[in-house]
Amino acid sequence: MAKIFIDRKNNSLLFAAVLLVCFLVSVLVRYQQFETWKKTPAAYFVGERPMMTTLDAPYWLRWAREYNEGIYKQKNGLRAYPGGTDTFKEMSLPLKYTDTAPASKSSSLSLSSGSPGISYRDVPLISYLIAHLSPFFNNNYYLTGTLLIPVLASLFILPLGMYFFRIGVPVSGLLGGLIGTFAGGYYMRSSIGRIDTDMLNLFFPVLAGLLILLAGKAKTERNVLLYSMGAGLSLFLFQWWYEKAGFTLAYFMV
């Protein structure tokens, strides 16, 4: 009995080590793209800002900056421009231009004091993470988001490997993680410069699936509740990250 326990423990440690290696390989391959960019900064950087390879990236980064500055969504003139502007909708030029009325003293004081009413839940999770990590990168939001990509895009490998290990096919979990992270579509959408929600769109569903599996295999009511809470939390974070409620409903249907 003791020998079986030791063998199982050794197998678990060996699998954990190999799984960690697969995760690091995925991280380093993506980070190597950034190192290649640094060799030709004139082509890939504007000052200290790395270029973006998706149109959504400046959108998330701007919201991260506005959240830190306390002006989140106070002005949203860049969204839906020019079709969202009143002038465009009216399809005519204004007859005259007038200055806006000067703000009262009380309103000026309230604006200068920032916007303490901004809730973290109102900010997309990707922007929230970048906003809080940007001080570690000298408030360079572009660099912060870029360096998050290799780690976040590779995270799904860990719960995927653990899932297949728990059902008795660990090799499938390891190969699935490696094939998945370097699959053409996912690799393209999670490469350096793609600051977008694709980075964690595999991680949260796979994590929820793992926790549901663990809840089904749990021996005590306490563990069932803990794993179920974890699954609910992962789906909550997925909703905050991607804002597509259909995925959560699909899990309830299953």
Predicted regions and their residues:
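Membrane-embedded, hydrophobic transmembrane alpha-helices
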Residues: 1-16, 114-118, 124-128, 144-146, ...
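Start-transfer (signal-anchor) and selected internal transmembrane alpha helices
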Residues: 1-44, 166, 174
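Secondary-structure transition/capping motifs at alpha-helix termini
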Residues: 136-140, 165-171
